[in-house]
From Swiss-Prot:
GO terms for cellular component: membrane. The lineage of its organism: Eukaryota, Fungi, Dikarya, Ascomycota, Saccharomycotina. Keywords: Membrane, Transmembrane, Transmembrane helix. This is Putative uncharacterized protein VPS65. It comes from Saccharomyces cerevisiae (strain ATCC 204508 / S288c). Partially overlaps SFH1. Disruption phenotypes caused by deletion of this gene may also be a result of a defect in its overlapping gene. Its main location: membrane. Disruption phenotype: Causes a vacuolar protein sorting defect. It is a multi-pass membrane protein.
Length: 104
Protein backbone atom coordinates (compact mmCIF):
# COMPACT_ATOMS: atom_id res chain seq x y z
CA UNK A 1 0.00 0.00 0.00
CA UNK A 2 1.32 3.43 -0.91
CA UNK A 3 1.82 5.93 1.87
CA UNK A 4 1.16 9.63 1.61
CA UNK A 5 3.69 11.86 3.32
CA UNK A 6 2.48 15.11 4.84
CA UNK A 7 5.08 17.65 5.88
CA UNK A 8 3.86 19.91 8.67
CA UNK A 9 5.72 22.86 10.17
CA UNK A 10 4.67 23.93 13.66
CA UNK A 11 5.40 27.63 14.08
CA UNK A 12 3.27 28.01 17.18
CA UNK A 13 1.85 25.27 19.38
CA UNK A 14 -1.18 27.39 20.21
CA UNK A 15 -2.03 28.12 16.59
CA UNK A 16 -0.41 26.23 13.73
CA UNK A 17 0.13 28.81 11.01
CA UNK A 18 0.96 28.31 7.37
CA UNK A 19 4.51 29.03 6.32
CA UNK A 20 5.95 30.29 3.07
CA UNK A 21 8.04 27.59 1.42
CA UNK A 22 11.19 29.74 1.35
CA UNK A 23 11.26 29.93 5.16
CA UNK A 24 11.43 26.18 5.64
CA UNK A 25 15.15 25.93 4.89
CA UNK A 26 15.87 28.12 7.93
CA UNK A 27 14.04 25.89 10.40
CA UNK A 28 15.93 23.46 12.60
CA UNK A 29 14.45 20.16 11.50
CA UNK A 30 13.13 17.76 14.11
CA UNK A 31 11.31 14.76 12.70
CA UNK A 32 8.63 12.86 14.54
CA UNK A 33 7.17 9.88 12.68
CA UNK A 34 3.59 8.74 13.16
CA UNK A 35 2.54 5.53 11.41
CA UNK A 36 -1.21 5.65 11.95
CA UNK A 37 -2.41 9.22 12.25
CA UNK A 38 -5.89 10.25 13.30
CA UNK A 39 -7.08 13.79 14.03
CA UNK A 40 -7.54 12.85 17.69
CA UNK A 41 -3.76 12.40 18.00
CA UNK A 42 -2.93 16.02 17.20
CA UNK A 43 -3.38 17.46 20.74
CA UNK A 44 -1.22 14.66 22.14
CA UNK A 45 1.47 15.27 19.52
CA UNK A 46 1.48 19.02 20.06
CA UNK A 47 1.95 18.53 23.80
CA UNK A 48 5.35 16.97 23.00
CA UNK A 49 6.36 19.62 20.47
CA UNK A 50 8.12 22.95 20.77
CA UNK A 51 7.70 26.05 18.65
CA UNK A 52 9.46 25.59 15.34
CA UNK A 53 9.40 21.79 15.42
CA UNK A 54 8.85 19.95 12.18
CA UNK A 55 6.51 16.98 12.09
CA UNK A 56 6.12 14.40 9.35
CA UNK A 57 2.90 12.43 9.32
CA UNK A 58 2.89 9.24 7.26
CA UNK A 59 -0.71 8.50 6.34
CA UNK A 60 -1.99 5.28 4.81
CA UNK A 61 -4.63 6.81 2.60
CA UNK A 62 -5.29 9.92 0.59
CA UNK A 63 -8.61 10.25 2.42
CA UNK A 64 -6.75 10.90 5.67
CA UNK A 65 -4.71 13.55 3.90
CA UNK A 66 -7.92 15.23 2.76
CA UNK A 67 -9.39 15.10 6.24
CA UNK A 68 -6.33 16.77 7.72
CA UNK A 69 -6.20 19.49 5.08
CA UNK A 70 -9.85 20.36 5.79
CA UNK A 71 -8.78 21.70 9.17
CA UNK A 72 -7.10 24.62 7.43
CA UNK A 73 -4.47 24.64 10.19
CA UNK A 74 -1.74 22.63 8.50
CA UNK A 75 0.58 23.50 5.65
CA UNK A 76 1.30 20.84 3.06
CA UNK A 77 4.66 21.19 1.39
CA UNK A 78 5.72 19.87 -2.00
CA UNK A 79 7.86 16.77 -2.27
CA UNK A 80 10.88 18.74 -3.49
CA UNK A 81 10.87 20.84 -0.33
CA UNK A 82 10.39 17.70 1.72
CA UNK A 83 13.44 16.22 0.01
CA UNK A 84 15.43 19.38 0.77
CA UNK A 85 14.39 19.12 4.41
CA UNK A 86 15.53 15.49 4.54
CA UNK A 87 18.87 16.44 2.98
CA UNK A 88 19.25 19.34 5.39
CA UNK A 89 18.54 17.02 8.30
CA UNK A 90 20.98 14.42 6.95
CA UNK A 91 23.80 16.95 6.61
CA UNK A 92 23.09 18.33 10.08
CA UNK A 93 23.35 14.83 11.55
CA UNK A 94 26.47 14.13 9.51
CA UNK A 95 28.05 17.37 10.71
CA UNK A 96 27.23 16.44 14.33
CA UNK A 97 28.81 13.00 13.92
CA UNK A 98 31.96 14.50 12.40
CA UNK A 99 32.16 17.02 15.24
CA UNK A 100 31.86 14.24 17.84
CA UNK A 101 34.51 12.17 16.06
CA UNK A 102 36.93 15.11 16.11
CA UNK A 103 36.59 15.32 19.90
CA UNK A 104 37.73 11.71 20.26
Amino acid sequence: MRHCIIFIVCISIVEIRTVHIEFIKEIVVIFRIVDHFSPFMLPCLLSHCKDGDTIIFVCQSVMKVRNISLWNKLVLVRHCVLLCAFLLSFFNVLHSIISICRIF
